[in-house]
Swiss-Prot record:
Gene: ppc
Pfam families in the record: PEPcase
Active-site residues annotated for this sequence: H158, K593
Catalytic activity: oxaloacetate + phosphate = phosphoenolpyruvate + hydrogencarbonate
EC number: 4.1.1.31
Keywords assigned: Carbon dioxide fixation, Lyase, Magnesium
Required cofactor(s): Mg(2+)
Protein name: Phosphoenolpyruvate carboxylase
Keyword Magnesium assigned: yes
Gene Ontology CC: cytosol
Functional description taken from the UniProt entry: Forms oxaloacetate, a four-carbon dicarboxylic acid source for the tricarboxylic acid cycle.
Amino acid sequence: MTSAVWAVVSEQEAGGPDKDQPLRDDIRLLGRILGDTVREQEGDAIYELVETIRQTSIRFHRDADEAARQELNALLESMTPEVAVQIIRAFSYFSHLANIAEDQHHSRRNRAHAVAGSAPRPGTLANALARAEKAGIGAAELRAFFDAALVSPVLTAHPTEVRRKSTMNREMEIADLLDLKERLQATPQEAREQDEKLRRAVLTLWQTALLRKFKLTVLDEVQNGLSYYDYTFLAEVPRLLCALEDHLAEQEGGEPGAELPPFLRIGSWIGGDRDGNPFVTADVLRETVRQHRDRVMAFYLEQVGLLVTELSLAKRLVAVSEDLTALAERSGDRAPEHREEPYRLALVGIHNRLKATVAAQKAADDGKTMGAAEDGHLPYPDAAAFRADLDILYRSLMANGSAILARGRLRHVRRAVDSFGFHLASLDLRQNSDVHERTVADLLEQAAPGTNYHALDEEARIAVLRAELTNPRPLASPFLSYTEETRSELAILRTAAEAHARLGKTVIPNAIISKAEGISDMLELALLLKEVGLVSATGESAINVIPLFETIGDLQACGPVMDRLLALPEYRALVDSRGGEQEVMLGYSDSNKDGGFVSSGWELYKAEIALIEVFARHKVKLRLFHGRGGSVGRGGGPSYDAILAQPAGAVSGQIRITEQGEIISSKYSNPENGRRNLEILVSATLESTLLEAEQASPRPEFLAAMEELSKTAFTAYRSLVYETPGFEDYFWSSTVISEIATLNIGSRPASRNKTRAIEALRAIPWVFSWSQCRLMLPGWYGFGTAIAAFVEARPVDGIAFLQSMYREWPFFRTLLSNMDMVLSKSSLAVASRYAELVPDEELRTRIFSRISAEYQSAITSLLAIMGQKKLLEANPLLDRSIRNRFPYLDPLNHIQVELLKLHRSDAGSDHVLHGIQLTINGISAGLRNSG
C-alpha cells in the first residue's frame, strides 16, 4: 500500500510541471509513513484490504464498471464492522495528510514567488497596493481609506467542523515538521531524525481518536475558537497593520507616519449566538467574555515578560526620555542588577500592573472590588492606560537612536493592544425575532394587562414600540412574574451590559436579529436593549442593532423595510448615535435552502443594490455583513472573488463576513495561511472600494437575463424540493441526515423542531448531508433547467449572450466558477449508491433520475458558457487537487452506504454507528468545504 496507494498521484501528475514535484514528494512520504503505520499497528490483512478497495473503487468511479460495483459490494458486505472501522480510519487519515501536504505546498509556492521577485499575485496586499499606485492613488487617499475601513472576519461555531482539537494539534505538528524539512538543509543524521519525528507524529495521529466521545458544549466551542488567536490572530493582525504602515511610510518619504487605526477586527459568534441554541445562557456569555479576556491578558503578560529580557539597554550607554525615567522609577523593582537598565525597570512595573489588573478582574468576577495589589501596583483601568505606558517606551527608543528596537516586539504589542484591548474578540449577540417578540409581549402584558401585543398588526406594534422607546420608564420589574424565556433573554442582555461596563463597548458591539422581516423586529430588540441600559430613551445606543434577512422573500423586502425604518425618528436617533452607520446582515444559507443556488445569489445581489439606494437616500453609511458558509451551497467559495463580485457601492471600505466550520481551521490554523487569508479580505475590500471605477456596471440586458434565469431556476428548485411528493422521504433515506444528529460536532440542534419537514431543517445540516452523498445538490440544482429555457427562447444567440455575461460580469463569472468547483466534487456514480438506500423503488427511480438529468444539464450548460471541454479546465490546480482525492474519498462513501444499510436494518451495533460517524469525518476532510 505504501507506494501503490499514492501511485495514482504520480500517474495523474505525469508530465506535470516541476514546481509540483515537492507536493508529490510530500504526499508519497506521508502515504508511505501512514502505510507503514497501518501495517505495523493493524497487520498485513488490513493493509492489503485498503489497497484492494481503493483499486476497485477507482474502476467503478472512472469506468462506471458494473463488475467493479458488484466486486466492491461483495468486499464491503463481507467486512465486519470492526474491520470497516480500521479501513475507514486509513482512508480518512489519507485525506487529512493530503490536506496537510497541499497546504504546505501552497505556502511553498507563495514563498517561491516572493523569493523569485515575481509580480505580486491577486489577493495579496502587494498586488492591491500596486494596483492602487498604478491607478494614481497616493498615500493620503490610502490613509483616508484605512481611517474609515472595517474588515472583520467573524468566527462562528456552526457544526461543520468535525475534527477534534487533539487531531488538529497533531496535524499542525506534522505540518510544522514538513515545513522544517523544506527549509532545513539537513545532514544525513538530521534527515533521519526528521523522518523519525514525522513517524512519531503520524503514529500519534493514528492512535488519537478522530471523534469526540461527548457532544461539544458551547464553552468547548469557545475554547476551540480561542485556539486561532494563539495560532494566528494575536501575531498576524498586528503584523499586517505594521506592514501597511511601512508601505505608507515608504510612499511618504521614509519617515514613520501616523499609525493606522485597528481596522482589521476579528469577531465571534461563539458564546453569543442564541438562535436555536438553548445552551447559550447568561452564564455561558459571562464565561465566554471571561475566557476571551483571560487569554489576551495572558498574551500581554507573556509579551511584556519577553520585552523585559530583550530591552536590556543601560542608561550609561544610551539616553532615555524623562517620561521613561519617571516610569522606571515607579516600577518598584529594587533589584541592583536592574538599577542601570531603565527600560527593564519600566517593563517590570508594567508587568506588575498587568498582574494587578488580572487580579482585579478576577476579583470583580467574584463580585469583589480591589484596589492596589499587595506590592502597591495599581491595576490598569483600561487597555488605553496600558497602551500609554508602552507608548512611553516607544517614544523614548525612537527619540534616542533605537528606532529598530522600537519597531520590533514593542511595536507589535502596541498594535495588538489597539486591536484586541482587554477583551480580545468583539462578540456578537444573535437571537431569533420570534423570541424577541414573545419577550416584548410578556413584558408589555405584565406591565399593562390587556395589551395583547401578539394580536396587534404590524402598524399597531410599531406605534406601541415607538412610544416605549422614548419612555424613560422601564417595563421590567423585579416584582412581576415572567416566563422562563423572558427571564433568560433579559439575563443575557444584562450580562452584555455588565461586560460593557467592565471592558468597554467593543466587547459586545453588535446584536443581530435573525429571521428579520419587518420594522417591529428591529424596534423590539431596541426596546429590550433599553431595558438593560444599552439603549437610552433619549436616542443613544451603545450597541449596533442589526437585521439578518435570510429568506428569498425577506431579501426582496429588505429595501422597503430599511427605507421605512430609517425614516422613523426614534430609530434614526439610534443610528446617528452610532456614527450614522447601520449594518445589515444577509443570509446566504437559508436563502439557498429556500430558493436554490441561482436564485439565492441573484436575490442577494439585488438586495444589496436596493439597500445601497435606500441608504444613499437617507445619508446613512451602509455596512454589509455576509453570512456565508463553507460550501458553495451556503455562499462559500473564494472570498477574494466574492467580494470583488459585489455590486458597486456595496463594500465602501467596510465588510464583515462569517468564517464557518471547517473553513476556520483550513484558513487560520497555520499563521502563514492565516496571514494570507487576512490579506485576501483586506485586499479585496481595498480594491472593490478604491478601484471601483474599473468595475463597469453590468449592462441592463445582463440584469434582465439574470432575473429570467433566477425565476426559472427558482421554479425548478422549489418544484423538486418542496413540491415533489415523497421528496422528504427520499432525502431522509438517501443521505446521512439522521446520523449527523448523533455526531458530536456542535452544541446546536440540527433542526429547529422535531419534524422531518425540509422547512424546519437548518441550512447547515441540509447542505452537509448533500455533500456527504456527493450530490452537492444545493450548489447547482435548477441551473441547467434555467439555461436550457433561456437558450430555447433564443436559439440563435442565447449561448453567445451568456458567454458575454460570463466574460464581462464578475458576479455571473463568480457564480459559475463556484458551480464549476461544486460539480467537479460531485459524483453521480457514488450518489447512485446512496439512492439504493431509498426503500421505495418507484420513489428512488423517479427522484434520482430527475436529479441525474438536471446534473447532466447543469454540466452541459456550464461548459458551453465557460467555453470549457471539461469541468475545472480553467483551474488545473484545483482540478488536480480534487481528482487526487477521489481514490481515497470514494471508498469512504461506499463503506458509508454499507454501514447505513446495516444501521437502518436494526442489525447495526455501536461499531456500525461509530463507523458511520468516522466516514462522515473522513468525507468532510476529503471535500474540505462540505458544510
